[in-house]
Structure formats: C-alpha cells, structure tokens
C-alpha cells in the first residue's frame, strides 16, 4: 500500500479538513542510499533542475555543490524521487525558469516546499514549471511570490497539492487547472484574485479549494469581476516583436511594482529582477538583494528551546510573533502559576520571532495561523468531549494530537504528540496520517522539557517547535 506524506490543516469543527498529500510510491517509503539509486538519465536531468534553483537562491548555490544531490542540505531522497524541504532558513531568491535542455520525464522531483523562506522568496510563477511531470506537492505559502496563476500548469499531470496561500498573487483563476487529473488541494486564500472559482473546479471530483468566500458567492461575478489588464492610454507599453532592443530591457525603471525584497529600482519591466538595491543591501548575480536576515542568528527553532510542559495547564502569551508558551512558570504547578484551559492543547507556532523582527504581513499571517490552531484543537475538545486533530505547523513536520478531556474528579488529559518522520503511517482519527513515531507522551507525569527523536533521516527539531504544552483539568 502506498506510503503517503500528508499535511493536514484542520479548520473550525464544521469546516472541511484539508489534506496535503505526498504519495511517494507503492513500495515502502525509504530514503535512497544515495544519488546512485537513480538511473544515469534521472541523475543528470534532476541535477540540472536543482542547479537552476541553486542559481536563483544564492544561499543554496553556496552549499549545493558537486553532483551528489542526495547529500545536499534541504534535500531528501526516496526510492521514488526527491523532495526539497526548506526549514529554519532566512534565504532570499526568486523562482527559476526551468532549463530547456532537460528531459523532464527523468526529473524526479516530487515535492518543493519553500514556505519557510517567507518574504525572502519573490518572483512570479514560471509557466515552464508545467514541465515537471512528477511534481506532487508545491508549497509557497507566505512567500512574496506575485503575478498570476499560469494556465500552463494544467499540464502538471502528477500535481496533487498546490499550497499558495498568503502570497501576492492576483488575476483570475484559470479554468484549465481543473484538467490536472490528480489535483486534490488548491489553497489560495490571502491573495488578491479577482473573479470567481470556475465551474470546472466546482465540478471536479474530490477537489478541495481554499479561498475567500467572496470568490464563491452567488453575486461573485458582479461584486468581484476582473478588470481589463490594460488601462486606457497604455497601448505603447507592449513592445514590438523585434530582437533589436536590448537597451530597453536593461534600463532600470523605478516602478512601484517591484517585488524584490530590498530593491529600490527594478530592472526593465521585470518585477522579479532588481537593478539597484536600497542602502544596506547588496545586488546578487541573480538580481536579488541581500541584506540583514529577517530573523537574527540564534533565532528560529532554537529560540524556543527550553519550552516547558505542565500538567496543570499552559501559560499562553499572544504577541507580535503569534502564540508563545511562557517558559518558567510551567514547572512549579502551583495554583495560579499559569492559567488552566478547560481542555485541549496549545501549539507554539514556530519559530516565534522577537518583536520588531517581522513585517506586518508576517505578523498578520502568524496571528491567523494562531487563531486557526486554537479553534481547531481547543474548540472540538470542549464541544465533543473527545477530539482527534491534525494540524500543520511551520516546521516541516506534522503533529497528531489525541485529546481526552478530564471526566469525573481524578482523570486527567492525555496528550500524545507524534512527529512525522515521513516513514510509515499511523491512524489519526478516521483518516490515515504519517505520524510514525511518538515524539513525547505525558499522561500524568511532569516533564521539564521536550526531546524529539530524529525526524526524516537525521534532521532534528525540538518538540517546542511542534507541541509544547498539554492542558488538563485539575485532579480532585
């Protein structure tokens, strides 16, 4: 039976559960012994495409050297293909065009997850990505990617999940995407789209679309109509189809639509290439701007180290960085040391940056995720007495939570947090999930800290980045 890697986003109790799938093969999922597990053609063509990403994201180019891509950071090789998983990074870069001299049937890239780059990733969605016939999961959530949805992506015959929430995308929703035979998840909320969800999307079997309600209402076509792309008086903006105008394309244009972080003037008509960076930034060969990282060194997942668990409840702080669990008071268990929720679990949204280290867009996105997590986990536990919930967090892992609220006078909540290692499966409620190994379990005893096992073949994360606190009704 196929071993699947799924990312589940649980909304409010009456909302639909969104499953992000990565079904890698019909054989047991296993990390390939190395690049040599692939054929010569697969090695050559996959390497060429990965090198295109390394050129577009300079920090990757510094480490992605040689030809043994299975040994590169942020890459996981399975027997059936390759996954690129960014985590705990402050890289900047753009989305590359796909190389022309590649046989894409031998490009074994199954998943691309660049969500952790946040506002450091800019550019537009390249139509040439339609060539990646094996791509199953694409996650660009929360990045600065802009432009429109390419109709050409309908040629992605293996695509199952496209996670494009909270970017800078605009335009209409392409009808042609409904022709993707395996597409199951399209997440588009938090963008600037116009028009309505196409009828062909609504009619497609098992397609789950996440987008604002005004794109689906009865008056959508009148209230949210798309305007013409060309404004009056701009007929001269489209250059003739000649090849003798190189000077025009290299002339900086100080337009306000530049999408490169830290850029003062974009290059020509491209919003994804910079000609001159602002003070404090330097221009790279890829026409991006490098400056002070959005998160200082020492931040990220490590910053949440030392988070504590408390049988009596959780102390929760809401700040600019989202939801954070207070550390010191959680060990003593003294009355009043920390507020006790009725039932449920509180998740720390990782990594919670310090105040002032994120822009307003990042803070808004974090608050939205905090609200979704709390409503997804705490509310069902209160309403139904027993809740099994799966939720997605910003680290490349999935947490399964089974919550049993206290019953009577002496029974306490039992919370089991299972961290995905992308190997094997475990049942989470009635739905299959890849929660393979138990990260931490504390039915009655107090723990001073959380210690996670190795996640997906060697990459280690702290439990504090996943689930940090278990709430319980007081005994007696």
Curated annotation (Swiss-Prot):
Residues 453-476 form a propeptide. Keywords: Cell membrane, Glycoprotein, GPI-anchor, Lipoprotein, Membrane, Repeat, Signal. It is found in: Cell membrane. It is a lipid-anchor; GPI-anchor. A lipid is attached at residue 452 (GPI-anchor amidated cysteine). Gene3D superfamilies: Ribonuclease Inhibitor (3.80.10.10). GO terms for cellular component: plasma membrane; side of membrane. Residues 231-255, 348-370 are annotated as: Disordered. Residues 1-32 form the signal peptide. Residues 107-202 are annotated as: 4 X 24 AA tandem repeats. The keyword Glycoprotein applies. Disulfide bonds: none annotated. InterPro entries: LRR_dom_sf, TAT_signal. It comes from the Eukaryota. Sequence repeats lie at residues 107-130, 131-154, 155-178, 179-202. Its main location: membrane. This is Surface membrane glycoprotein GP46/M-2. It comes from Leishmania amazonensis.
């Amino acid at each position: 039976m196929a071993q699947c890697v799924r990312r589940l986003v649980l909304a409010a109790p009456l909302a639909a559960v969104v499953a992000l799938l990565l079904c890698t093969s019909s054989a047991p999922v296993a990390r390939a012994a190395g690049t040599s597990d692939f054929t010569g053609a697969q090695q050559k063509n996959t390497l060429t495409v990965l090198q295109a990403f390394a050129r577009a994201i300079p920090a990757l180019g510094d480490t992605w050297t040689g030809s043994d891509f299975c040994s590169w950071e942020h890459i996981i090789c399975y027997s059936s293909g390759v996954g690129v998983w960014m985590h705990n990074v402050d890289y900047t870069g753009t989305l590359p065009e796909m190389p022309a001299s590649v046989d894409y049937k031998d490009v074994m890239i199954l998943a691309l997850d660049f969500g952790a780059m946040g506002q450091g990733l800019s550019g537009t969605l390249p139509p040439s990505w339609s060539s990646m016939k094996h791509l199953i999961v694409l996650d660009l959530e929360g990045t600065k990617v802009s432009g429109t949805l390419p109709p050409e992506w309908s040629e992605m015959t293996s695509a199952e999940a496209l996670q494009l929430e909270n970017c800078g995308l605009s335009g209409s929703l392409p009808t042609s995407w409904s022709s993707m035979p395996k597409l199951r998840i399209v997440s588009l909320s938090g963008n600037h789209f116009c028009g309505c969800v196409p009828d062909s999307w609504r009619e497609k079997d098992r397609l789950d679309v996440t987008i604002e309600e005004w794109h689906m209402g009865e008056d959508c076509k009148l209230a949210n109509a798309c305007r013409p792309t060309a404004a009056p008086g701009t007929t001269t903006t489209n250059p003739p189809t000649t090849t003798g105008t190189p000077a025009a394309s290299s002339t900086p244009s100080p337009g306000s639509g530049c999408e490169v972080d830290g850029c003062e003037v974009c290059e020509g008509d491209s919003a994804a290439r910079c000609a001159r960076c602002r003070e404090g930034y330097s221009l790279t060969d890829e026409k991006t701007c490098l400056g002070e990282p959005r998160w200082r060194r020492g931040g990220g997942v490590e910053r949440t180290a030392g988070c504590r668990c408390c049988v009596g409840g959780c102390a929760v702080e809401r700040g600019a960085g989202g939801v954070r669990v207070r550390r010191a008071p959680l060990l003593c268990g003294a009355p009043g040391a920390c507020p006790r929720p009725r039932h449920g679990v509180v998740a720390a949204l990782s990594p919670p940056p310090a105040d002032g280290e994120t822009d307003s867009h990042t803070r808004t996105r974090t608050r939205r995720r905090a609200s979704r997590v709390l409503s997804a986990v705490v509310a069902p536990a209160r309403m139904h007495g027993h809740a099994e919930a799966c939720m997605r967090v910003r680290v490349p892992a999935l947490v399964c939570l089974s919550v049993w609220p206290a019953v009577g006078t002496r029974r306490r909540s039992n919370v089991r947090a299972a961290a995905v290692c992308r190997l094997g499966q475990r049942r989470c409620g009635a739905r299959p999930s890849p929660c393979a190994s138990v990260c931490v379990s504390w039915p009655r005893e107090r723990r001073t800290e959380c210690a996670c096992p190795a996640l997906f073949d060697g990459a280690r994360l702290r439990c504090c980045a996943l689930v940090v606190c278990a709430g319980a009704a007081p005994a007696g």
